[in-house]
Amino acid sequence: MAPPPARVHLGAFLAVTPNPGSAASGTEAAAATPSKVWGSSAGRIEPRGGGRGALPTSMGQHGPSARARAGRAPGPRPAREASPRLRVHKTFKFVVVGVLLQVVPSSAATIKLHDQSIGTQQWEHSPLGELCPPGSHRSEHPGACNRCTEGVGYTNASNNLFACLPCTACKSDEEERSPCTTTRNTACQCKPGTFRNDNSAEMCRKCSRGCPRGMVKVKDCTPWSDIECVHKESGNGHNIWVILVVTLVVPLLLVAVLIVCCCIGSGCGGDPKCMDRVCFWRLGLLRGPGAEDNAHNEILSNADSLSTFVSEQQMESQEPADLTGVTVQSPGEAQCLLGPAEAEGSQRRRLLVPANGADPTETLMLFFDKFANIVPFDSWDQLMRQLDLTKNEIDVVRAGTAGPGDALYAMLMKWVNKTGRNASIHTLLDALERMEERHAREKIQDLLVDSGKFIYLEDGTGSAVSLE
């Protein structure tokens, strides 16, 4: 940056005209001073000496110089010394004016740039046409927002206010729950032992010390409510009854509903003895696996006793039997007891055989196309692996089928062709049991029996039982 120009006094360039009363002669004055000096009275430059353009003399005449009047030829003109001084003075004025013209615009540009920077910072806080955010208010500058002072003022929402809302000071009977911030007013509440509600909105009241006689307190005093009292009869007594109902009556109702559901599904018909025994046996399931096994064993023991008793009755039909202490059960009751207890075990021990002595493998093959709707699609490959088909055999069969629905039928046929007479319905059912596909297993059994093609053969009895 160039240094500022030095101050130059205008008087340094001005020559003062000599006093008319001075003793210096005209010639000495001409020799001692330049040919053009500033006149003291006229305020302009007066050239001295002869020649063209000489000023008038004291007589008001224009004429030659003093040397010409004296009869001497005019010599060479002395060098004019006023012109360089005038040129320097004019040059100085142009320089001063030029410097001022450059300084003033630059100063104005600096001020304008400063204002623009301030305006830009305010513009970033609140764009023109939008509300000021919470915690600020509208400034006097358009589009600008000023922040509220913490603990002094606040605004809790977008606004166009020109000043923040003043913070509230808690009263003498209140305490500060939370201080005032730029976005939230002071939160005050009554001091401990006092409260304020809708009935005393202006001041805090003292809490009651206790409940009236015959009443009990159910709620303590808070800054917003007094203590709550209720009558003893409608207080603790009511709560006790509610607790008793919830803890005793509801579980009893659930147990009763469970017993009814168990007895209805027992298959005993209207026989009350059968229903009693079956219901109590099923309730034994709730006590754990040991209780279930004991009940099952008791039922089997009763069934054996019944069979022995019936045989003895047939052998000793003409002799009275002393049946003291022996519980006699009817065949219907025994079947009722054995039915629920051995629902799954009896199916494991009973064999499915073709009716009328038909070939078991060929009869089973008649149902292969229906098994695809019973066995889940995702379990087909696993079932085939349980039936000892290899992965390569499964892939080859799947590749040779026309559609995905025919894959299970083709794989079952592959299984029959591979194992021959060993491909039985029991091998298939056992494979489903190992896969835990019990639902599919039971549906296949029902399908075979309901069709009349298969019947159950009781294990160890040799008698076939049809479930049609």
UniProtKB/Swiss-Prot annotation:
Residues linked to a glycan: 156
UniProt PTM comment: Palmitoylated. Palmitoylation of TNFRSF10A is required for its association with lipid rafts, oligomerization and function in TRAIL-induced cell death. Palmitoylated by ZDHHC3.
Death domain: residues covered: 365-448
Topology term for the membrane: Single-pass type I membrane protein
Impact upon substituting residue 261 to S: No effect on palmitoylation. Loss of palmitoylation, decreased association with membranes, decreased oligomerization, decreased death-induced signaling complex assembly associated with decreased function in TRAIL-induced cell death
Signal peptide boundaries: 1-23
Annotated protein name in UniProt: Tumor necrosis factor receptor superfamily member 10A
Organism: Homo sapiens (Human)
Classification of source organism: Eukaryota, Metazoa, Chordata, Craniata, Vertebrata
Gene (UniProt): TNFRSF10A
